[in-house]
């Protein structure tokens, strides 16, 4: 069982990245009965407009996407000058 000490360090760092245009693959409209509460991702506000992509734009999707923001959470515990454990969580956000 882990015991947390007072010298636990929590670093939250937001690193701005390159702004990339929003790229989404076209998807068929969902029936109204299943549109609510599916992972919270399909509930767009009415003001959001998504245009279907042309085939050349679809070919650009994949590993070449540049994320627009990176959030890094780092948790570590030190005893004297030695790091006992450290966990770093990186979240990439597409805009």
UniProtKB/Swiss-Prot annotation:
Q: Where is this region: Disordered?
A: 1-73
| Comp. bias intervals (Polar residues) | 42-52, 62-73
Q: What is this protein called?
A: Putative uncharacterized protein ATP1A1-AS1
Q: Which organism is it from?
A: Homo sapiens (Human)
* Chain's gene name: ATP1A1-AS1
